Each structure stands twice: as C-alpha cells, then as structure tokens.
C-alpha cells in the first residue's frame, strides 16, 4: 500500500511539472504571437494582482491569523507545495491570485482548535489592517513609481519651453526658427511660458514685429511678419507656426517625494470622482445600453472593477472614446500602445491603474475589500459593554450576489464593446 501511495504521489508530481511546463510554453507562445509589449502588459497585470494578495497574506501572517492557501492563478492546479500550514501553488489561468484566510465570515466552519486564529476573532485594528493591505499595496506601488519617475525622468519644467516643431512656410520658418530654439520675446514682450507666447502672437495678426531667439546660449534679433489664421468665430488671429517642447526637470529625493505625494492625492481624487460618476443610475444605464457616457465626474485614468474593467481617459485617444470603460482586453491593448510609446508613458499607465484598482477595492460592498472594512467597522460600532457583536453574513448574501452580477454585467459589456469597436490608441 505504501508503495502504491508513493507511486501515486510521484505520478501526481510529474503531472504537476508537465502542466507547469505547458503553462510556461503557453505564456512564451503568447509573447511570440502578441509581441513583447503584450507579454509585458499581461505580466504586469498579473504581478499587480499577486502583490495585492501578497499584501493580505503578509499582514494576516503577521497578525497571527491562519492562512491555508496562497495561489497564483485560478482554475485547475498546476503545481503546489505545502510549507507549514500554508499551501503555495500555481493554477492554470494566470488571471491574478488569491489568499485563503480562515474564518473570513461568520458562515465559515472552523475547527474549534484554531478558532482563536481566525480573521473573525481578531481585534478591529488587525482586521482593518488585513482588509486594507491589498489597496495599501497598490498605493505603495503607485507612490514608488511616481517617486522614480520624478527622480529618474523628471517633470516638464513649467518655467521653460523651447521650440519642438516648426510649421513649413510659416512666419517662424521665414526667420529660420529651429527645433530647440528658445523664443525670448515677441514685440518686446517676454514669453516665459508657451501660453503667454500664444496670447501675444494671437493679438498681432499681420504685424511686423521683432523676435529675439536664443540658440546654443547665444541671442539673435529678427524682424518678421506675424501670419494670420481665420478662427471659427470669424475673427483673425496671429499665427507664428511653432509647437512647444518643455524640457524635463529632474527632482531630488525630497522634491520628488513632495511632488509624488501631491500627484498621488490628485489621482486618488480623480479616481473617486470617476467611480462616483460612472456608478450612478444614469451612468450605469447609459453604459449598459450603449449610450454616451457622461463626462461629468470622469477621470483621466483607469478604474478596475470586477472582472477587470478599466476606465480610461487618455490624451492620445479620440475624444469620443476618452471616457470609455475598457475591459481587461481593451486595457491590455491600451497598455501595449503606451509601452510602444515609451517606458515613461507605460510607467504612468501603471501608476494610474494601481491607484484606480486600490480605490475601487475600497468601495464598501462585498466581495470587495471595502466590504470587509465596512463589516468590521459596523461590528465595532455595535460591540458595546465588552460584548463582541458579529454581523449575520447570511443577510449580506443577496447584496453580495447583486454586486457580483452587476460587476460581471459591466465586464461582459465592456469586453463586447472592445471586441467589436475598440478605440484606436495610435
């Protein structure tokens, strides 16, 4: 009998290895078919979701809770190993990860011997820490990437601009303005910002003016006639014929930390506005029926929902589609386009998506992390006189299923729209 058992275990281990090799082969094949950028984007999504669950896992273990499983992927098991009381492994569908913490609700049946180590028996601060750990991980990743971008890449210097492009045959071309030149003044008026420059030029149609240029540290004075452009309202505005390029300004550690924190707060606020604007009755009905989405409350970024839906607004996308909700497929295509545009653009994509996933998971409804936060807070408020109140999880089942159904419907509609009419990301 022992020999049969040992042989069975060896056969199962061999099957695990075969399935794992097949998964690796499938991933490599996807990279060859979808290209390196597609593989990088999908891998980034998986890593983000694994880090989310890793946050829950680490905090639960540090809090003394029993964690029985930590798996990457879903579906059939490909490989697993048991270390202590936790089974670690990989499953066939690399769509994220999950952690199984004992006693997450009052409905879970638990061995009385480990009841004291369940999630439901822990103190309010410990339960809050575990529930918030996933979103906190996304926020930490976003802040770290923001800090890196400002230190390594920088931000556009608001006090300086140079010529980034010159229109052929324009007034600028007539005096040999070149890319990289700095326009110091027009008609004796200094132009510290491109917006200031535009205001000045638009008010000088057909006028002969003096222009001071700076090239390679040397200044030169030129005289030119400002071009003319007919505006929509019938007025004539001045036209110079240049586009701006704002030099990047790298920041030191302190400045980068301050800038990253301020930008992070802005992104959180925009994500909240976007979620509130979308998950209103009008917003949902408009989306599910294929109508135009309201731009009110929309945010330039991504918001992740159940089934992996992401709301995107990007300057490179057609305005009609810029507030459109994308499925995970559409988001992957967008990420690939951003990666093709350069690593800096792709880092901003990762920053935005991490912030939005973190915020979305704090929505106070099960099965999202925010639902566990709401339940823990409700139980804390109801627990008086030293008596612990435990919420009746059976009452939450209908609401939970309603939320899941809504999120699945949104994800399916978003996927359908992306398949039949995916926006052109360039």
PLM ranges: what are they?
Residues 1-35:
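Topogenic membrane-insertion module of multi-pass membrane proteins
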Residues 2-5, 36-113, 353, 360-384:
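Small-residue-rich helix-interface/hinge motifs
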Residues 13-16, 117-118, 122, 229-357, ...:
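Functional transmembrane alpha-helices
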Residues 26-29, 397-418:
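Final/C-terminal transmembrane alpha-helix of multipass membrane proteins
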Residues 31-40, 342:
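Transmembrane helix interruption/hinge and helix-loop junction motifs
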Residues 61-62, 95-165, 346, 398-403:
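Internal alpha-helical transmembrane segments
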Residues 172-194, 264, 399:
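Conserved PDZ fold ligand-binding element
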Residues 178, 184-185, 198-241:
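PDZ-domain C-terminal substructure recognizer with occasional recognition of PDZ-binding tails
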């Amino acid at each position: 009998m022992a020999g049969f058992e040992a042989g069975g275990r060896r056969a199962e281990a061999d099957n695990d290895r075969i399935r794992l090799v097949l998964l690796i082969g499938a991933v490599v094949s996807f990279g060859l078919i979808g290209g390196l950028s597609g593989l990088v984007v999908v891998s980034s999504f998986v890593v983000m979701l694994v880090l989310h669950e890793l946050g829950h896992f680490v905090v639960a273990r540090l809090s003394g809770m029993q964690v029985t499983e930590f798996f990457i992927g879903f579906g059939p098991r490909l490989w697993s190993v048991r270390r202590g009381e936790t089974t670690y492994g990989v499953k066939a569908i690399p769509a994220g990860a999950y952690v199984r913490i004992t006693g997450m609700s009052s409905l879970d049946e638990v061995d009385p011997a480990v009841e004291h180590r369940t999630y439901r028996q822990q103190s309010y601060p410990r339960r809050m820490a575990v529930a918030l750990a996933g979103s906190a991980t996304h926020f930490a990743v976003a802040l770290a990437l923001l800090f890196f971008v400002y230190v390594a890449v920088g931000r556009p210097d608001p006090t300086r601009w140079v010529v980034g492009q010159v229109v052929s045959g324009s007034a600028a071309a007539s005096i040999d303005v070149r890319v990289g030149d700095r326009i110091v003044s027009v008609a004796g008026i200094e132009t510290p910002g491109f917006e200031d420059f535009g205001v000045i030029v638009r008010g000088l149609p057909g006028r002969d003016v003096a222009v001071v240029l700076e090239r390679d540290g040397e200044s030169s004075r030129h005289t030119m006639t400002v071009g003319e452009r007919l505006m929509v309202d019938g007025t004539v505005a001045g036209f110079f014929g240049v586009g701006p390029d704002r030099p990047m300004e790298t920041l030191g550690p302190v400045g980068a930390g301050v800038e990253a924190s301020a930008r992070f707060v802005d992104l959180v606020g925009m994500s909240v506005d976007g979620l509130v604007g979308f998950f209103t009755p009008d917003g949902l009905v408009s989306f599910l029926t294929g109508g135009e989405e309201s731009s009110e409350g929309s945010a330039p970024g991504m918001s992740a929902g159940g089934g992996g839906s992401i709301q995107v607004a990007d300057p490179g996308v057609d305005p009609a589609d810029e507030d459109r909700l994308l499925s995970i497929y559409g988001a992957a295509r967008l990420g690939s386009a951003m990666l093709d545009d350069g690593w800096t653009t792709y880092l901003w994509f990762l920053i935005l998506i991490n912030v939005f996933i973190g915020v979305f998971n704090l929505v106070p409804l099960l099965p999202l992390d925010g639902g566990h936060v709401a339940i823990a807070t409700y139980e804390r408020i109801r627990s008086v006189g030293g008596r612990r109140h435990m919420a009746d999880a059976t009452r939450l089942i209908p609401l939970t299923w309603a939320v899941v159904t809504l999120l699945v419907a949104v994800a399916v509609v978003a996927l359908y729209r992306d398949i039949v009419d995916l926006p052109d990301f360039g």
